[in-house]
Amino acid sequence: DRGFGRSGYPAISMSAQAAESFCKWLSTRTNQTISIPTIEQWNSANTSDGGAWHKWNADKSTHPIATTKPNSLGIYDMRGNVGEWVTTKDGPRVIGGSFRTPAEEIGPSSLLTPIKDWNITDPQLPRSPWWFADADFVGLRIVINEGDFNE
């Protein structure tokens, strides 16, 4: 699907640059400090329970958000449906697995480094820094950080 976050579906196909820019934009709109989670934040929010859309049950497509069981912290879709950007000491990565990931690989062990093939069919020249034409399995989760907002 190319819903890009509309109609209750996860926002997909965005590059790390686009995800970071969205967080900055949303921060200024809400006067809150919003960011992509660090890998440590993501791991703290991830528990081994809760539902997940994966290769064996997703029928080759993303699904509306919050349609599986939440984890014990009450957070939906931490694993599966779409992989999520996190920041690491080695740069941005995609974690959690997606609707294309086998069930046994869903979770924190599914950690991907972005590759050029995620944008191979982008018709723009130069290729877009904002979206990945071939990475409909990459999405975004945001973190609202405590403290004062700084532009």
Give the role of each language-model region.
Residues 2-122, 134-136:
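Functional-site microenvironments in short loops/helix caps that host divalent-cation chemistry
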Residues 136-150:
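Short, structured beta-strand segments at or near domain termini in extracellular proteins/domains
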Residues 124-131:
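Short, P/G- and charge-enriched loop/turn segments at secondary-structure junctions
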